[in-house]
């Protein structure tokens, strides 16, 4: 029998006895006073007197409730305002808090709020979506709460150690007497659970309304215990309400009963007994509920526990006894696909359903056509698992995708009677087994291209310095294998456009890889072990042959400019990577890509920049210093090499782009294993600039109109000169600057020691495939350019110098020295002549000395100063406030200009005459 149908006589007798017990009457009580005592309506309308503690704590709980509601709707600015009010209210409650201690609900709010703000602060994507006010309020509130919580570190630490126990103690000891405040606290607990995902057991059931509590039977012990708890938690509440009723009665006896109700010791012991009894009853109630759940039959009510996912049975694909044929499977497939893309669709469950459907089709031998169609939809569902374009596939989904594509290609290779294509309409599909070949709508090339893009996303979003990146990179072999299989399939059954597309995919996985085995074969080296030799013999063509075949097919057959442009750039990159400088240079010049590359899309521009950089590095390895400098000039002079090569974003440009543009640019980044070493690139550029700039500076030392070949190199020189104390070089740039200073003096050995040493070898030169050849080339170039610099700098000191002496100084062969000096004389860089019998260089001394150069510069500057003074004087004398007419003023200016022109021409002619005479005089002396 239900407990709600208990007899009411016991409860009535209890009510009457309790009423007699509560309202004893003195002898002098009048009827009017009895009527006033029994007037419930008037008693309800009386004002309730509350203590200061209740008022302050209720104010705090109301503010806490508002804060939690603001947290619920992510209103951080509202949260900040309410938190400031809460801090002020807590200061007002300081006297009560000093007596009673800090309330537990206040500590819980501080701890939860700090955790919530830290969670929001770490969520970078969520911060970007915030509006300006919330973002500003978040940083302000986070600083305030961290500073404010320092005063409550011990309380917060104890709460975090056992949050459930703290919540129980709060409900038992710090509960406010009014029902409204209790409901507020319950609401606060709900908000906390939802906001911070902390599951707390609900300890108290919702209390019944006031009208129903008088109709409960005597057997309802839980309601009595709850009423006792409410009446005895705060003594001040009960005393306040009882004192009001006694004032209405007006008798001294009732007042005595109220104030002399129980002793303090008895009250404390009774409270402990009630707590123990209440906990015991709660435990019994939980055990009874567990037993009832265990004995419940099927079809009855089931209690759902929060946070525990229910294990759902797999839905049945077909009803029992249904005949499985192609039409039924296609209908079921369309039903599954109708939910694709809709809100609330479980994508993982949809993929499982499609796998189950494929298994059913295979079990019933419905043919390969329906299997191909289901596989197409499984792969498409795997791609749709992450609706966000920026998100990458998880490892398990990626493995499933590769397996499904391999299975699909197996079916297509094993069955030549299957035709697939995007131009096949769904109505004209032939999926059933018949004499006609299978016709399935779909495009295997699109699926493989999307798979390749997903692989790139995975590599972009993986930490390049982790083992996970290496593990993911191992999948590239499988990706290339799938592309090769698709290439074989489309060569027989695909169109020309499809073949060009799949060829480009194969090229993009080949062009940046150095073929070490082909390089070893070109040098005549063989594998060290027998297995390596057998492997080299069994391997197919070199990458150069593969690239040449694929690219030439695209050059001849492709109709789109983009695929042809990408193929040309990849072909040039591959030639340059393998030191085929002349083929790479000729292909770049014949393609004329540099004329219209600015109109290409950003990924193609990034590929063009990478190709130009690789072309410059190739020219440097071959000793073409000027070509290397010209190829690298545009990339390095911009100061944005990292961004132009698609290897990262610059922080200084972050303010110029919004969040959406930043995501787009991140998707264009090149994976880490395809990066070009930026330090190597900068070193090659600076060394090339040094070999060009230092001799040029020595040749035009006194030329005021001297141009700079490399601004970045001059900037590094100025930075080195500004340093007050020069120590040994440490960074790559410091090594190049120190080498440049040594080359200025013609000291090639010091320059060589700064450019080629253990530190520079480990950082730069050992990264080249032919490091030894590169170092030998560098030594030769340093010797030659140091010789040129020496002759430019000290030609005014010598009357003649022996070429044999120069050969010994710079450790160059005599023919090489002869060749260098001859070129300098032919190009009119060095005013000298060669005396063949004596093998000496005779200086002509046509160039002025340093003192004469300084005098000429001073004369030119004085001439410019005189001209400026005359111009200022003319302007001052020519302004007469409109007194003269325009003709007179114009005539005056013309006259002055005529005189100035004559003087200027005569001065310049005189100067030139003097210089010419000086030179003629010097020449005649020889």
Curated annotation (Swiss-Prot):
Residues 890-919 have a biased composition (Low complexity). Residues 274-283 have a biased composition (Basic residues). GO terms for cellular component: eukaryotic 43S preinitiation complex; eukaryotic 48S preinitiation complex; eukaryotic translation initiation factor 3 complex. SMART domains: PINT. Keywords: Cytoplasm, Initiation factor, Phosphoprotein, Protein biosynthesis. Residues 200-210 have a biased composition (Basic and acidic residues). Gene3D superfamilies: Winged helix-like DNA-binding domain superfamily/Winged helix DNA-binding domain. It comes from the Eukaryota. It holds the Pfam family PCI. Its main location: cytoplasm. GO terms for biological process: formation of cytoplasmic translation initiation complex; translational initiation. InterPro entries: ARM-type_fold (IPR016024), EIF3C (IPR027516), EIF3C_N_dom (IPR008905), PCI_dom (IPR000717), WH-like_DNA-bd_sf (IPR036388), WH_DNA-bd_sf (IPR036390). Residues 220-235, 287-299 have a biased composition (Acidic residues). GO terms for molecular function: RNA binding; translation initiation factor activity; translation initiation factor binding. Residues 1-27, 157-251, 266-300, 890-926 are annotated as: Disordered. It is found in: Cytoplasm. Component of the eukaryotic translation initiation factor 3 (eIF-3) complex, which is composed of 13 subunits: eif3a, eif3b, eif3c, eif3d, eif3e, eif3f, eif3g, eif3h, eif3i, eif3j, eif3k, eif3l and eif3m. Belongs to the eIF-3 subunit C family. Component of the eukaryotic translation initiation factor 3 (eIF-3) complex, which is involved in protein synthesis of a specialized repertoire of mRNAs and, together with other initiation factors, stimulates binding of mRNA and methionyl-tRNAi to the 40S ribosome. The eIF-3 complex specifically targets and initiates translation of a subset of mRNAs involved in cell proliferation. This is Eukaryotic translation initiation factor 3 subunit C. It comes from Danio rerio (Zebrafish).
């Amino acid at each position: 029998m239900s407990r709600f149908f208990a007899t009411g006589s016991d409860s009535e007798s209890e009510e009457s006895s309790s009423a007699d017990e509560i309202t004893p009457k003195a002898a002098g009580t009048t009827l009017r006073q009895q009527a006033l005592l029994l007037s419930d309506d008037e008693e309800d309308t009386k004002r309730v007197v509350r203590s200061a503690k209740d008022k302050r704590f209720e104010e705090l709980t109301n503010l806490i409730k508002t804060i939690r509601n603001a947290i619920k709707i992510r209103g951080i600015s509202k949260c900040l305002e309410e938190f400031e009010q809460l801090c002020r209210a807590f200061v007002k409650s300081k006297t009560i808090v000093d007596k009673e201690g800090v309330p537990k609900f206040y500590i819980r709010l501080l701890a939860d709020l700090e955790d919530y703000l830290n969670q929001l602060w770490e969520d970078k994507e969520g911060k970007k979506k915030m509006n300006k006010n919330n973002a500003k309020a978040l940083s302000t509130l986070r600083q305030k709460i961290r500073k404010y919580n320092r005063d409550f570190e011990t309380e917060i630490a104890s709460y975090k150690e056992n949050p459930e126990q703290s919540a129980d103690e709060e409900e038992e000891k710090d509960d406010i007497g009014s029902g409204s405040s209790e409901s507020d606290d319950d609401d606060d607990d709900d908000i906390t659970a939802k906001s911070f995902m902390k599951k707390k057991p609900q300890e108290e059931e919702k209390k019944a309304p006031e009208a129903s509590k008088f109709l409960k039977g005597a057997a309802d012990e839980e309601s009595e215990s709850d009423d006792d708890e409410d009446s005895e938690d705060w003594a001040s509440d009960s005393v306040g309400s009882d004192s009001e009723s006694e004032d209405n009665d007006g008798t001294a006896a009732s007042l005595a009963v109220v104030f002399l109700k129980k002793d303090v010791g008895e009250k404390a012991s009774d409270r402990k007994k009630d707590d123990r009894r209440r906990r015991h009853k709660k435990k019994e109630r939980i055990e009874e509920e567990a037993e009832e759940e265990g004995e419940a039959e099927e079809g009855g009510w089931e209690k759902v526990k929060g946070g525990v996912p229910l294990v759902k049975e797999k839905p049945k694909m077909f009803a029992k006894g249904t005949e499985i044929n192609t039409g039924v499977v296609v209908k079921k497939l369309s039903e599954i696909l109708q939910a694709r893309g809709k809100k609330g669709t479980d994508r993982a469950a949809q993929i499982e359903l499609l796998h189950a459907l494929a298994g059913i089709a295979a079990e019933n031998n419905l043919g390969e056509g329906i299997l191909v169609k289901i596989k197409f939809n499984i792969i498409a569902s795997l791609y749709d698992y992450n609706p966000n374009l920026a998100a990458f596939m998880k490892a398990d989904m990626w493995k499933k995708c590769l397996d499904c594509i391999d299975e699909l290609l197996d079916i297509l290779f094993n069955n030549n009677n299957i035709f697939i294509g995007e131009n096949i309409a769904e109505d004209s599909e032939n999926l059933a087994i018949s004499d006609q070949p299978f016709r399935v709508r779909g495009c295997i090339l699109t699926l493989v291209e999307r798979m390749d893009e997903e692989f790139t996303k995975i590599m972009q979003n993986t930490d390049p310095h982790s083992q996970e990146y290496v593990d993911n990179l191992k999948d590239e072999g499988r990706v290339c294998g799938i592309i090769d299989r698709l290439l074989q399939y489309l060569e027989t059954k695909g169109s020309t456009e499809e073949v060009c597309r799949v060829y480009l995919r194969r090229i993009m996985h080949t062009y940046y890889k150095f073929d070490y085995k082909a390089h070893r074969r070109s040098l005549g080296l063989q594998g060290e072990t027998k297995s390596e030799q057998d492997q080299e013999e069994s391997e197919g063509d070199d990458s150069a042959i593969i690239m040449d075949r694929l690219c030439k097919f695209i050059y001849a057959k492709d109709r789109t400019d983009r695929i042809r442009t990408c193929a040309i750039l990849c072909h040039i990159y591959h030639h340059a990577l393998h030191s085929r400088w002349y083929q790479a240079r000729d292909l770049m010049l014949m393609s004329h890509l540099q004329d219209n590359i600015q109109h290409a899309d950003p990924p193609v521009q990034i590929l063009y920049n990478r190709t130009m950089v690789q072309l410059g590095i190739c020219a440097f390895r071959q000793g073409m210093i000027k070509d290397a400098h010209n190829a690298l000039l545009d990339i390095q002079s911009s100061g944005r090499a990292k961004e132009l090569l698609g290897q990262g974003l610059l922080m200084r440009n972050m303010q110029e782009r919004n969040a959406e543009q930043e995501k787009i640019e991140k998707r264009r980044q090149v994976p880490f294993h395809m990066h070009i070493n930026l330090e190597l690139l900068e070193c090659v550029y600076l060394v090339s600039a040094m070999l060009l700039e230092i001799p040029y500076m020595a040749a035009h030392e006194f030329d005021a109109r001297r141009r700079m070949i490399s601004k970045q190199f001059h900037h590094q020189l100025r930075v080195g000169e500004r340093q007050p104390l020069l120590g040994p070089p440490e960074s790559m740039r410091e090594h190049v600057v120190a080498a440049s200073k040594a080359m200025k003096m013609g000291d090639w050995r010091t320059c060589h020691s700064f450019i080629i040493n253990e530190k520079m070898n480990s950082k730069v030169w050992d990264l080249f495939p032919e490091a030894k050849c590169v170092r030998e080339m560098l030594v030769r170039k340093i010797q030659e350019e140091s010789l040129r610099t020496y002759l430019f700098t000290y030609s005014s000191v010598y009357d003649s110098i022996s070429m044999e002496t120069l050969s010994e100084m710079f450790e160059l062969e005599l023919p090489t020295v002869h060749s260098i000096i001859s070129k300098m004389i032919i190009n009119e860089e060095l005013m000298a002549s060669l005396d063949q019998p004596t093998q000496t260089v005779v200086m002509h001394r046509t160039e002025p000395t340093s003192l004469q150069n300084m005098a000429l510069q001073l004369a030119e500057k004085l001439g410019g100063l005189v001209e400026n003074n005359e111009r200022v004087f003319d302007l001052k004398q020519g302004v007469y406030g409109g007194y003269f007419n325009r003709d007179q003023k114009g005539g005056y200016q013309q006259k002055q200009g005529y005189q100035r022109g004559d003087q200027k021409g005569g001065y310049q002619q005189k100067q030139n005459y003097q210089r010419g005479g000086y030179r003629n005089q010097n020449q005649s002396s020889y």
